[in-house]
A protein has these predicted regions:
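N-terminal signal-anchor transmembrane alpha helix
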Residues: 28-63, 230-241
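Membrane-interfacial, low-structure loops and terminal tails that flank and connect transmembrane helices
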Residues: 2-21, 197-220
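Individual transmembrane alpha-helix segments
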Residues: 80-118, 273-293
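Hydrophobic cores of alpha-helical transmembrane segments in multi-pass inner/ER membrane proteins
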Residues: 116-121, 179-196, 292-299
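Membrane-interfacial catalytic/cofactor-binding modules of polytopic membrane enzymes
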Residues: 236-293, 298
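Interfacial helix-loop-helix junctions of multi-pass membrane proteins
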Residues: 47-56, 153-174, 241-250
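Interfacial segments of alpha-helical transmembrane regions
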Residues: 25-36, 136-145, 213-236
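Conserved small/polar residues in nucleotide/adenosyl-binding loops
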Residues: 305-307
Length: 307
């Protein structure tokens, strides 16, 4: 058996003794969660694009699920928003109706997070009581739930950065919030696809035991992992671009600021701040990472089909 196959068997969440109907139920459940996470990310993106993220100035994990229901409640929420820099420096004079539009975007984003938590927790308890969850899968699911809870707290930590001295949120916290969302999504898919229907014996039978196969498999695994890491870094770089509105000032392609490698990439001091706070450098890095991902993916595909 190849090393790759042995590793796959070691890390798989599949238990060959699990009935097929248990596997199907767990896969459906995790698939629904993955779909909702994508919806959550899309709504979060819309919340960012509409500058709605600071419209709710407090974090109430339980009672916050209920939106303002009366005129007095709406007025109280609006008055709280009027105290933060985004209103006093950018949106002064905004009407209550315009504020409601911002509020609903942010409320929908937070509500989706709560809803995903319930979609995870309630079926999880039902599956656990019914004996559907294999022993090796249990700590992974619990870890995923904890990560989701931490993501909610991180979201508030991000929003909090824009309530006192800034008119927007910290790009560092925005990138961290988005990065954790991607980790949760990726972990959910990993658990879902780990619940395969083949047995260990079938997997062993399909694996060729040769030195050449082991070497090729190891190289393929490392290359795929490197590409996955590059994609993750590219997503984080995109979040940094969004966090400092870097796309607005440099919106031409393939040139940026009139050149493929523009001047001004080292304008900030100390030098490392350019990677995170210089809009030109942040967008340049984002583009270069994109090119790198494309080239690496094509090279990997060609190597797999032996061209």
């Amino acid at each position: 058996m190849t090393e790759a196959a042995a590793q796959a068997l070691k890390t798989s969440t599949h238990d060959p003794a699990m009935p097929a109907r248990h596997i199907r139920a767990l896969r459906l459940w995790l698939g629904v969660i993955a779909f909702l996470i994508v919806a959550m990310i899309l709504v979060g993106g819309a919340t960012r694009l509409t500058d709605s993220g600071l419209s709710i100035t407090e974090w109430q994990p339980i009672m916050g699920a209920i939106p303002p229901l009366t005129d007095a409640h709406w007025q109280a929420a609006f008055e709280a928003y009027q105290k933060i820099p985004e209103y006093t420096e950018i949106n002064r004079g905004m009407s209550l109706e315009a504020f409601k539009t911002l509020y609903w975007w942010e409320w929908a984003h937070r509500f989706l997070g709560r809803f995903i938590g319930m979609v995870f927790l309630l079926p999880f308890l039902a599956f656990w009581i019914a004996g559907y969850i294999p022993r090796k899968l249990m700590p992974k699911l619990l870890g995923l739930f904890v990560l989701g809870g931490l993501q909610g707290a991180l979201g508030w930590y991000m929003v909090k950065s824009g309530l006192v001295d800034r008119t927007d949120v910290s790009q560092y916290r925005l990138a961290a919030h988005f990065g954790v969302a991607i980790l949760i999504f990726g972990t959910t898919l990993w658990l879902l696809f780990g619940l395969g229907t083949e047995t260990r014996e079938e997997t062993r039978a399909s694996c060729a035991d040769s030195s050449a196969t082991r070497t090729e498999s190891r190289a393929t695994r490392w290359a795929a992992s490197a590409i996955l890491l590059l994609v993750f870094l590219q997503l984080l770089a995109g979040a940094l671009v969004a966090g400092i509105d870097g796309g607005l000032g440099f919106n031409t392609w393939p040139l940026i600021a009139g050149a493929f490698i523009p001047s001004g990439l080292d304008a900030a001091s100390p030098w490392y701040l350019n990677l995170f706070e210089n809009p030109l450098t942040v967008q340049f890095d984002h583009r270069m990472l994109g090119y790198t991902v494309v080239i690496a993916t094509i090279a990997q595909a060609l190597s797999l089909i032996h061209i």
